[in-house]
Amino acid sequence: MNMAGFKSSVYKVNALGFWKLEDDPLEFKFDDEKKRVNVTVKGHEVGRNDIQFGAGYSQLDGLFAQAMFNTRNFLGRGDVFGISLQTGARSDYYTLTFSDPYFLDRRMIVGASIFKTNIDVADFYRDTKGASATLGFGLGRFDTLSFLLSYEDVFSRYSVYKSGFVGDPTAGHVPPLQPPPKDQQPLDVASEEFAGKVVSITPSYSYDSRDDPFDPNRGARFSLRLRFSGGPLGGDFDYVRPELAYSLFVPVTKHTVFAFNVEGGQFFVYNNSEIPIYERYRLGGDRSLRGIPYYTVLPRDANGNYFLTPGGARLGGDRYWQVNLEYQFRLGGPVKFVMFTDLGNTYFETQGWDFASFRRTAGLELRVTLPMFQAPLRFIYGVNLDPYPDENKSDFEFSIGTTF
């Protein structure tokens, strides 16, 4: 009996998300007379449908109300259908999605979505509406090749500090702006607006051997995406954006897991185009550098100054990288305790890949997986290990989902 192949098959079934294995899922009984092995796979069925109505609070969205329906077995055919409505103090999300993960009874996924989102956080507001279509193929046991065609129409508005600070952009001074002290408020705040359409196609390759898509204990995930925007596709911006990500989950003991994630990306423009300001990289928050508020890790020079548009809006990076390290303790049932440290940064074009300049955070996290959610509730306390004068030394976050 090929035990490695058998266990791989069991974990692959678990990765579908319809079945949840127990901690010791396999029980073997050997029948020497008949030369047979009876195998019992222990676990329980996972709900296929999610219906949510409620209200809540997260650091990113503020107070919000939501209604959501999602099923991974639409009309009993194994299709995925979802509709989600969420409105809050700082963000709104409206999405409609459908996909067939086994189109024509083959390992082929076909899907489409339409969406409208807006977010008002940190120093910017962004409103996005668009649609996308997906075509994917299974290459091997854990490999997938997919293509995403996307259209996005974006309007954005960025704060500009017009007076009261060193480096006043209204006085013709456009080098990096010195960040204000935390206790000083801008005397006159204006805004700069940007809008544009992005049409893109993104081929991607992924490898995913994790034993559970929502709460993995072992396995790895690798993805390589290459987004082509503009050119013959149209739109207002011409660029290529490769992005790479790798995650690893290693069980250390029966109740502990070491988890590692590294990722990065970079823009390359062509046809004398430019990077849309609303797509430039910004880090911070529970999905990147925990302990620093959402979207506030922007490129800075050696003196801690931001890079600005000619009008005075702060610019994100044309490249980024991040590393996340976790040691997870399962306390019992759906509860996990996590120790973490995060590293990473964003860089402006003139800085290149300055790996000697990076941000560091560390902290603790409590995760609780409830039956009505497919992703864990997270209570995160992070410490900014090298804060700038305009930053807090720590941050508490509440969210739903995972960092990687």
Task: Give the label of every model feature segment.
Residues 1-57, 68, 82-100, 240-245, ...:
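Periplasmic polypeptide-binding modules associated with outer-membrane biogenesis and secretion
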Residues 15, 35, 50-53, 58, ...:
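C-terminal outer-membrane beta-barrel translocator/porin domains of Gram-negative envelope proteins
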Residues 19-21, 49-51, 62, 74-81, ...:
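Repeated loop/turn-to-beta-strand initiation elements of outer-membrane beta-barrel proteins
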Residues 33-34, 57-64, 83-94, 119-126, ...:
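Solvent-exposed loop/turn segments connecting transmembrane beta-strands
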Residues 49-59, 65-88, 110-120, 220-232, ...:
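Transmembrane beta-strand segments that form the barrel wall of outer-membrane beta-barrel proteins
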Residues 69, 202, 364-370, 375, ...:
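Outer-membrane beta-barrel "beta-signal"
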Residues 71-73, 100-102, 137-139, 207-209, ...:
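Residue-level signature of outer-membrane beta-barrel architecture
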Residues 94-197, 203:
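Transmembrane beta-barrel wall of Gram-negative outer-membrane proteins
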